[in-house]
Amino acid sequence: MSDDHRRSVSSVPTVHLLGAFALHTGGETIPLPVDSRRLVAYLAVHSRPQPTAALAADLWPGVRPQAAARLLDEAVAGVDVPGLLAADDRGRLALGPGVATDLADAMLLIRALSASRIEQRPDVELLEHDILPSWTASWIAVERERFRQLRLSALERLSEGLTAAGRHEDAVQIARRAVSTAPSRERSRRALVEALLAGGDVAGAMHEYEEFQQLLRSSIGATPDSELDRLLVPHDSGWPLGPGLHRPIERWGVGMPG
């Protein structure tokens, strides 16, 4: 790679949304005013060009349209990074065509994981964090939850694929990432239990099962039937823990929330 190409790549603006907001260009972190940061984040989450009236209304809900439009103009003026923003012939705003975002990279990874057979453990660092978890604006909450569901499903599928491929240690590590994000999500916990059982760690699987049951008891006051029961209930004396070692847990006639 030539020095000119390296400089060109490093000067591409990159917007980070996963975990925390950051803007990098030319190898440096670029500070932005608060409203400019919110504008850039909004455009990074919504990749299509945005009409300015709707954009201002979303960014400043409850503010009169004229005042919101002024705030938007000020936010645009505060983005002093060449190529970061672009307007089309209808005046709609978007990030510039050369701008990179970690969210877009994460979505590419999610699509790749869903489209390919899993035999090796890929780098899933992009799937570790939510979109701007400390931000409370209503416009970000919907996109955050949508991405959260997508990344959890991707981690679960990856763990299940690694278990099927006999890569049990990798499967356990991936499933633990999902469980740490959503401890009460049954599919994440099931992927972890399956990986532990496949690797011969019956005690670890029982620990995860019992922790999940305790979490349900503390949150909803009961432990509804789940797929985990079918993984761990002894069918005969050949069950891995041996006869009589599984402690049955009382069931209640309730359904899972949501």
Predicted regions and their residues:
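Basic, amphipathic DNA-recognition helix from helix-turn-helix-like DNA-binding domains
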Residues: 1-12
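Intrinsically disordered, charged and Pro/Gly-enriched terminal/linker segments
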Residues: 2, 28-33, 45, 60-71, ...
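Short beta-strand
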Residues: 13-16, 84-89
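A structural micro-motif at secondary-structure boundaries
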Residues: 17-37
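Conserved RecA-like P-loop NTPase ATPase core
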Residues: 23, 55, 79, 205, ...
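Amphipathic alpha-helical regulatory segments at dimerization interfaces
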Residues: 42, 58-62, 78, 82
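Short capping segments at the starts of secondary-structure elements
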Residues: 42-55
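C-terminal flanking helix
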Residues: 73-84, 213
